[in-house]
Amino acid sequence: MIGRIAGTLLEKNPPHLLVDCHGVGYEIDVPMSTFYNLPAIGHPVTLLTQQIVREDAHLLFGFATATERNTFRELIKITGVGARMALAVLSGLSVPELAQAVTMQEAGRLTKIPGIGKKTAERLLLELKGKLGADLGHAPGATPLADSAVDILNALLALGYSEKEAAQAIKQVPAGTGVSDGIKLALKALSKG
């Protein structure tokens, strides 16, 4: 199994890459979240990978983070979700956005992704519940923070907090709070321990 590729980026044409690793060119498909963070052609690149071997093909998928790769692995375990659909999900939603959609049971967010219908979205919500790490949920009846929760989560992750710590702190932020104030409140909650 190929778990990581480090080499020189030779080509990039969404979602396909060609990475030269000591004279061997590896064709790798990546989600758009990884694609947008790639260096320029000719520069070094390192990707975590998932290799899928089928009767008719050997496929290699690349990811910028372990969280993305782990989410991809969870997605392809779901009946009816293949590697291409999993890649589409990760291209349409970031991992924190997907975790929030699962926690809030927002099938509508998933059906906006090309190739995902209502039944598939509902299956994804059911199968992924409790498997994505960051629990961005709120108490029943509480108003969700919506997209600001994702921005707050990303800020806390960038500051070095774990997904679990960040998610717990976000629960302390009242609904309707802006991103800037939400970050301050979450940091205050984290400092109280």
From Swiss-Prot:
Record region (Domain II): 65-144
Q: Which GO terms describe its molecular function?
A: ATP binding; four-way junction DNA binding; four-way junction helicase activity
Q: InterPro entries of this UniProt entry?
A: DNA_helicase_Holl-junc_RuvA_I (IPR013849), Hlx-hairpin-Hlx_DNA-bd_motif (IPR003583), NA-bd_OB-fold (IPR012340), RuvA (IPR000085), RuvA_2-like (IPR010994), RuvA_C (IPR011114), RuvA_C_sf (IPR036267)
Which cellular components does GO assign to this protein? cytoplasm; Holliday junction helicase complex; Holliday junction resolvase complex
Its predominant location is cytoplasm
Task: Determine if DNA-binding is one of this entry's keywords.
Answer: yes
Q: Please name the SUPFAM superfamilies in this protein's record.
A: DNA helicase RuvA subunit, C-terminal domain, Nucleic acid-binding proteins, RuvA domain 2-like
Return the annotated region ranges for Domain I.
Answer: 1-64
Q: Which UniProt keywords apply?
A: Cytoplasm, DNA damage, DNA recombination, DNA repair, DNA-binding
| Cellular localisation | Cytoplasm
GO BP term, pick one = DNA repair
Q: Where is this region: Flexible linker?
A: 145-151
What the entry lists under SMART domains is as follows: HhH1
Q: Which domain of life is it from?
A: Bacteria
Q: Where is this region: Domain III?
A: 151-193
List, alphabetically, the CDD domains matched.
UBA_RuvA_C
- Write out the domain note: Has three domains with a flexible linker between the domains II and III and assumes an 'L' shape. Domain III is highly mobile and contacts RuvB.
**Function statement:** The RuvA-RuvB-RuvC complex processes Holliday junction (HJ) DNA during genetic recombination and DNA repair, while the RuvA-RuvB complex plays an important role in the rescue of blocked DNA replication forks via replication fork reversal (RFR). RuvA specifically binds to HJ cruciform DNA, conferring on it an open structure. The RuvB hexamer acts as an ATP-dependent pump, pulling dsDNA into and through the RuvAB complex. HJ branch migration allows RuvC to scan DNA until it finds its consensus sequence, where it cleaves and resolves the cruciform DNA.
Quaternary structure annotation from Swiss-Prot or TrEMBL: Homotetramer. Forms an RuvA(8)-RuvB(12)-Holliday junction (HJ) complex. HJ DNA is sandwiched between 2 RuvA tetramers; dsDNA enters through RuvA and exits via RuvB. An RuvB hexamer assembles on each DNA strand where it exits the tetramer. Each RuvB hexamer is contacted by two RuvA subunits (via domain III) on 2 adjacent RuvB subunits; this complex drives branch migration. In the full resolvosome a probable DNA-RuvA(4)-RuvB(12)-RuvC(2) complex forms which resolves the HJ.
UniProt similarity note: Belongs to the RuvA family.
This chain belongs to the protein called: Holliday junction branch migration complex subunit RuvA
Q: Which organism is it from?
A: Cupriavidus metallidurans (strain ATCC 43123 / DSM 2839 / NBRC 102507 / CH34) (Ralstonia metallidurans)
